[in-house]
C-alpha cells in the first residue's frame, strides 16, 4: 500500500492483479481502522469502484468529487496517502474526509451530504467556459441522493444537458437503512436487470410497429409509453434528462470498466447506477443491518467487538431519547423525528415502542424541521433529534416555519460543541450564534445528565413556543439521576460556587473546567464565583444585574464561537443597560474552522482549558496576598 504514490499504478494492472489489490486494500483498511476508528463500512464497499474510477479517469485532471466524503479512504490510498493512515482522524493527521490542502486529487471538500452534484455542475460549466476537456465525475450514494439539494441539482443538470458522469453508489444505506419513494425506485431498478439492454430491445420492438395512419400511430405511441414505464424504472433519471446505465455490479471490474468506457463516449449527463455492498469483505460490517458499522471507534478484528473506553455516565444521546420515550408513555402528543440518524440519536427504543410516532425522514433536514412545524400546528409535541452541524442546513425552516409562527417544537441539538475526529465539517460550534437572535426561541444547555433529564422534561412541558436543548457528544459525568423529573424555571441560572473577587459565567461542558479553575485559584487567595448560565436565551436578567452592580470582573467561557455567542450576549446586555465600566472578557472558539483531533487536544490548541481560565482570571483580578 505504501508504495502507491499515484493512481496511474492501477492503469496497467490485469484484472487478477486488481482483484489482489482490492483484497490487500480491504485487509489494510480493516487493520488500520481497528486502531484509529473511522468510516469502515462505506469504504469497504467502494474498493473496486474507486480502483475502476482511477483506472478509467485521469485524476487530478479529471475531477472525482466524493459526496459526503466518508467513503474516500480508498481514493486516499490510491493517491499516495497510505503511509499516513496511522494518523487517520488524529490531531494534525490525515483527515477522514477529502481535503484540498492535503492532495491535488481532492478537488472538493465534503462532510455534509448531497453537495457533490451542484459542485460538479459548477466545475463542468467552468470547464466549458474555459474550453477544456476534462471529465467531471461526482460519486454520490443512494442515501445522499434523497437530499433535496441533490434533487435540485439533478433537475438543473438535466435541463442544461451538462456533460458529466454521475456515479450513483447504491448500497441501500446512508448511515441507517434508507427510506423514501426514491429508495423504492432504486430498489425496483436493482431487480430490473440491465436497463440499457432492455431499452435497446424495447426500441427494436417498437420500430417493428407500423406507424400507418393517425390512429395506429397514436396507439403505437401509447404502447411505447406503457412498455417504457412497465419495463424500465430507469425512466426516472431519463425523464430528468440523463442517460441511465446500469445496474452495474460494483464489485465486478469488467462490468465497471465496460459501463464507464461507454459513459465516457456519451454526450450530456450520464448516470451510472452501481450496486455495492457496504462493509464488503469484513463480516461484522457486511452483515450490519442498522448502521452500527458505518463509522466506528477502535475494534477487535477477530470478534468485531468494539474497544470500550471507560465512560462515567450514560450516553447523552441515549439519556435524551430515553427520557423522551419515558414521557411519551403518558403523553400521546410526543412524536420523534430524525433526519437519517436513528442510531446516532439512540432512537431505536423509541421507534420500537412507538413505531407510529417515529419518523426517519432520510437526509432531509429542511423537511424534518417543517414537518415538525406542521405537527405542532395540530397540537402535537414534535421532538426533533438533530446534530448541531446538520441543523445549519435547516436554518430558514427554523426561522420562517417554526420560530416565526411560535410553534411548540423541541429541538434536541446533539453533538453541540467540539466533536473531535470528524473535524471542521462536524464541529457543533455555530448553533448558539445562529439561534440566539431568533425571536421566540428558548435555548438552553445542561451542566450534567441529571440537569439534562430535567431540561428534557421542561422542554416537553413547555407550551409557549419553540425550545432547544443543546448537549455534547459522548457520555455524561456519572452523576446520580433523580427519580422524579421536574421543570426548571425558564431563564434561570444557578450559582455553583460563591466568590467575591471575580465571576465565571459558563454552561455545559465548560462548567467542570471552570470549577477546577476556581479550586486552583482559591489556593492563591482568589475567590471566584462560578455561575451555571444554563439558559442562553432568555438569560437570567436578575442575576446579570446583580453581578454587574457588584462590579466583579466577569469572564464568560463557552465551547462555541465567540462571534455572536453567549459572551457577546452578556456584553450586549451590559452595554444596553448602562454598565459601561464593567470588566467583561470572553473565552471560546476563535474565528476559524477547527480541524480534527481529540477534543482535549483541540481545547488545548485554542486555549480553552482550566489552566487557560486560571491565567485569564489572574490578569483580570488585582494581585492579592495568599490567604492563610
UniProtKB/Swiss-Prot annotation:
InterPro entries: Dxylulose-5-P_synthase, THDP-binding, Transketo_C/PFOR_II, Transketolase-like_Pyr-bd, Transketolase_BS, Transketolase_C, Transketolase_CS. PROSITE patterns: TRANSKETOLASE_1, TRANSKETOLASE_2. Pfam families: DXP_synthase_N, Transket_pyr, Transketolase_C. SUPFAM superfamilies: Thiamin diphosphate-binding fold (THDP-binding), TK C-terminal domain-like. Binds 1 Mg(2+) ion per subunit. Pathway: Metabolic intermediate biosynthesis; 1-deoxy-D-xylulose 5-phosphate biosynthesis; 1-deoxy-D-xylulose 5-phosphate from D-glyceraldehyde 3-phosphate and pyruvate: step 1/1. GO terms for biological process: 1-deoxy-D-xylulose 5-phosphate biosynthetic process; isopentenyl diphosphate biosynthetic process, methylerythritol 4-phosphate pathway; terpenoid biosynthetic process; thiamine biosynthetic process. One of its GO terms (cellular component) is cytosol. Its EC number is 2.2.1.7. GO terms for molecular function: 1-deoxy-D-xylulose-5-phosphate synthase activity; magnesium ion binding; thiamine pyrophosphate binding. Its cofactor is Mg(2+); thiamine diphosphate. Keywords: Isoprene biosynthesis, Magnesium, Metal-binding, Thiamine biosynthesis, Thiamine pyrophosphate, Transferase. Mg(2+) binds at residues 142, 171. It catalyses: D-glyceraldehyde 3-phosphate + pyruvate + H(+) = 1-deoxy-D-xylulose 5-phosphate + CO2. Thiamine diphosphate binds at residues 70, 111-113, 143-144, 171, 282, 365. NCBIfam families: dxs, PRK05444.2-2. Homodimer. Belongs to the transketolase family. DXPS subfamily. Catalyzes the acyloin condensation reaction between C atoms 2 and 3 of pyruvate and glyceraldehyde 3-phosphate to yield 1-deoxy-D-xylulose-5-phosphate (DXP). This is 1-deoxy-D-xylulose-5-phosphate synthase. The gene is dxs.
Amino acid at each position: 500500500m505504501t508504495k502507491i504514490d499515484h493512481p496511474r499504478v492501477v492503469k496497467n494492472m490485469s484484472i487478477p492483479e486488481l482483484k489482489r489489490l482490492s483484497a490487500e486494500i480491504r485487509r489494510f483498511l480493516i487493520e488500520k481502522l481497528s486502531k484509529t476508528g473511522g468510516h469502515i463500512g462505506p469504504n469497504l464497499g467502494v474498493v473496486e469502484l474507486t480502483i475502476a474510477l482511477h483506472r478509467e479517469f485521469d485524476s487530478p485532471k479529471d475531477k472525482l468529487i466524493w459526496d459526503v466524503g466518508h467513503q474516500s479512504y480508498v481514493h486516499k490510498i490510491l493517491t499516495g496517502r497510505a503511509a499516513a493512515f496511522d494518523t487517520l482522524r488524529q490531531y494534525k493527521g490525515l483527515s477522514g474526509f477529502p481535503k484540498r490542502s492535503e492532495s491535488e486529487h481532492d478537488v472538493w471538500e465534503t462532510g455534509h451530504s448531497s453537495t457533490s452534484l451542484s459542485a460538479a455542475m459548477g466545475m463542468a460549466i467552468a470547464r466549458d467556459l474555459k474550453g477544456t476537456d476534462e471529465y467531471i465525475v461526482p460519486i454520490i450514494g443512494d442515501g445522499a441522493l434523497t437530499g433535496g439539494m441533490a434533487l435540485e441539482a439533478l433537475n438543473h443538470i438535466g435541463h442544461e444537458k451538462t456533460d458529466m458522469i454521475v456515479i450513483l453508489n447504491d448500497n441501500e444505506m446512508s448511515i441507517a437503512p434508507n427510506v423514501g419513494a426514491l429508495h423504492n425506485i432504486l430498489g425496483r431498478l436493482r431487480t430490473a436487470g440491465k436497463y440499457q439492454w432492455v431499452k435497446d430491445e424495447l426500441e427494436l420492438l417498437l420500430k417493428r410497429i407500423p406507424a400507418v395512419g393517425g390512429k395506429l400511430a397514436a396507439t403505437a405511441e401509447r404502447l411505447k409509453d406503457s412498455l417504457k414505464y412497465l419495463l424500465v424504472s430507469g425512466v426516472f433519471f431519463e425523464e430528468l434528462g440523463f442517460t441511465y446505465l446500469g445496474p452495474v455490479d460494483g464489485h465486478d471490474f469488467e462490468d465497471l470498466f465496460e459501463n464507464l468506457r461507454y459513459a465516457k463516449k456519451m454526450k450530456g449527463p450520464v448516470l451510472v447506477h452501481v450496486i455495492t455492498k457496504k462493509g464488503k469483505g469484513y463480516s461484522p460490517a457486511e452483515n450490519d443491518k442498522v448502521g452500527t458499522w458505518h463509522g466506528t471507534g477502535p475494534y477487535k478484528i477477530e470478534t468485531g467487538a468494539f474497544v470500550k473506553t471507560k465512560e462515567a455516565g450514560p450516553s447523552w444521546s441515549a439519556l435524551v431519547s430515553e427520557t423522551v420515550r419515558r414521557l411519551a408513555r403518558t403523553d400521546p402528543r410526543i412524536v420523534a423525528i430524525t433526519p437519517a440518524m436513528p442510531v446516532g440519536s439512540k432512537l431505536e427504543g423509541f421507534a420500537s415502542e412507538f413505531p407510529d410516532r417515529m419518523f426517519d425522514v432520510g437526509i432531509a433536514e429542511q423537511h424534518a424541521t417543517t414537518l415538525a412545524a406542521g405537527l405542532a400546528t395540530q397540537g402535537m409535541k414534535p421532538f426533533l433529534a438533530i446534530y448541531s452541524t446538520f441543523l445549519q442546513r435547516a436554518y430558514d425552516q427554523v426561522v420562517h416555519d417554526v420560530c416565526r409562527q411560535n410553534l411548540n417544537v423541541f429541538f434536541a441539538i446533539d453533538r453541540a460543541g467540539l466533536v473531535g475526529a470528524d473535524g471542521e465539517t462536524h464541529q457543533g460550534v455555530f448553533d448558539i450564534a445562529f439561534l440566539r437572535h431568533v425571536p421566540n426561541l428558548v435555548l438552553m444547555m445542561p451542566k450534567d445528565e441529571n440537569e439534562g433529564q430535567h431540561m428534557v422534561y421542561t422542554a416537553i412541558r413547555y407550551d409557549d413556543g419553540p425550545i432547544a436543548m443543546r448537549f455534547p457528544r459522548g457520555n455524561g459525568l456519572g452523576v446520580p439521576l433523580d427519580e422524579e423529573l421536574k421543570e426548571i424555571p425558564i431563564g434561570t441560572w444557578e450559582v455553583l460556587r460563591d466568590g467575591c473577587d471575580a465571576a465565571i459565567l459558563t454552561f455545559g461542558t465548560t462548567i467542570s473546567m471552570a470549577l477546577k479553575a476556581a479550586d486552583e485559584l482559591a489556593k492563591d487567595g482568589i475567590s471566584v464565583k462560578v455561575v451555571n448560565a444554563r439558559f442562553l436565551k432568555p438569560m437570567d436578567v436578575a442575576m446579570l444585574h446583580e453581578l454587574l452592580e457588584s462590579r466583579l470582573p466577569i469572564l464568560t467561557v463557552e465551547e462555541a464561537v465567540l462571534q455572536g455567542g453567549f459572551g457577546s450576549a452578556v456584553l450586549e446586555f451590559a452595554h444596553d443597560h448602562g454598565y459601561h465600566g464593567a470588566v467583561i472578557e470572553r473565552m471560546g472558539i476563535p474565528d476559524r474552522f477547527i480541524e480534527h483531533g481529540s477534543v482535549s487536544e483541540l481545547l488545548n490548541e485554542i486555549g480553552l482549558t482550566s489552566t487557560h481560565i486560571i491565567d485569564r482570571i489572574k490578569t483580570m483580578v488585582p494581585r492579592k496576598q495568599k490567604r492563610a
